[in-house]
């Protein structure tokens, strides 16, 4: 099983890349995290936010593995605890197949793409920088895995 993070945006600061890499490398080989960056569309006078999101959605869908479980990150998504994420991770491992977490661009995710997602989740009620979301998601996936393994990283 592979955990894939598909994120709109590229050319992140080095500290974002280092933070993401730190948590990604901690994952076991059978549950590795891969990042696929999607080039953001430029908004101009003739391109509305809706148009930009549609164009980005097409790129996102092209980056998704066939048959994967898509989980979209959205400010109106389900608020999970880390323990609930760990329970979900265990269930996904038992079901098999790849999991793709989708992080939208500056305007968010296209509504049609969100409708295709199996689940909408949010990391916080706060508005977060998109680069930071990558790091936080990777950390939470590592923490969820550590809970399933009784690893001392997560302390109650």
From Swiss-Prot:
Catalytic activity, as annotated: pseudouridine(1915) in 23S rRNA + S-adenosyl-L-methionine = N(3)-methylpseudouridine(1915) in 23S rRNA + S-adenosyl-L-homocysteine + H(+)
Entry EC number(s): 2.1.1.177
Principal place of residence: cytoplasm
Keywords from the UniProt entry: Cytoplasm, Methyltransferase, rRNA processing, S-adenosyl-L-methionine, Transferase
Any one GO molecular function term: rRNA (pseudouridine-N3-)-methyltransferase activity
Gene Ontology, cellular component aspect: cytoplasm
Location(s), subcellular: Cytoplasm
CDD domains assigned to the protein according to its UniProt record, in alphabetical order: RlmH-like
Binding-site residues, S-adenosyl-L-methionine: 73, 104, 123-128
Keyword check for Cell inner membrane: no
UniProt-listed Gene3D superfamilies: 3.40.1280.10
Domain of life: Bacteria
Protein family membership: Belongs to the RNA methyltransferase RlmH family.
Annotated function: Specifically methylates the pseudouridine at position 1915 (m3Psi1915) in 23S rRNA.
Quaternary structure note: Homodimer.
Record's protein name: Ribosomal RNA large subunit methyltransferase H
Native source organism of the sequence: Ralstonia pickettii (strain 12J)
Name of the gene: rlmH
């Amino acid at each position: 099983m592979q955990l894939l993070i598909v994120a709109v945006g590229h050319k992140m600061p080095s500290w974002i890349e280092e933070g993401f890499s730190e948590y990604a490398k901690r994952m076991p080989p059978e549950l590795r995290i891969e990042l696929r960056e999607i080039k953001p569309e430029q908004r101009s006078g003739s391109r509305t936010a809706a148009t930009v999101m549609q164009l980005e959605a097409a790129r996102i869908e092209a980056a998704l593995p066939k048959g994967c479980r898509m989980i979209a990150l959205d400010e109106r998504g389900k608020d999970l605890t880390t323990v609930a994420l760990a329970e979900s991770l265990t269930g996904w491992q038992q079901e098999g197949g790849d999991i793709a977490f989708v992080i939208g661009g500056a305007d968010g995710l296209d509504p049609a793409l969100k409708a295709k997602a199996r689940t909408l989740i949010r990391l916080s009620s706060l508005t977060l920088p998109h680069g930071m979301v990558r790091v936080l998601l990777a950390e939470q996936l590592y923490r969820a895995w550590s809970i399933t393994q009784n690893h001392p990283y997560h302390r109650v």
